[in-house]
Amino acid sequence: MTGIPEPFGEIAVEELAIRLGEVPVLDVRTRSEFDGSAGQPCDPRQGHIPGARNVDISRLVELGRDDIEAALGLEPGDEIVAYCHSGSRSAIATQLLRGLGYEARNYVGSWHEWSRREELPIE
């Protein structure tokens, strides 16, 4: 055992859509991206994935394990899906969470993909 986390897993939009409400979702975008007030011109819809908790990646990387558990309501070993706008910030979050013992998965398509799928719900 080297202490280096295994490469992080990914989740496809289809699986995430089916599992909404079952698996915790973490949005690591800024608050204004999360609430839709940032108004990203490349996204046809603004907001976030239903039920997602928002912890900006810049804050997440500064939190300790206890603070993350409190903010997310999770314990090590629990599954969680992270997303952002295009999958890069959520990749960092996924690695960080996996390093702390969570079963974290990255939704690579992130909001850029989700916002384009009219059949998918948003808040």
Each model region followed by its residue ranges:
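Rhodanese-like catalytic fold shared by cysteine-dependent sulfurtransferases
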Residues: 1-24, 28-81, 85-123
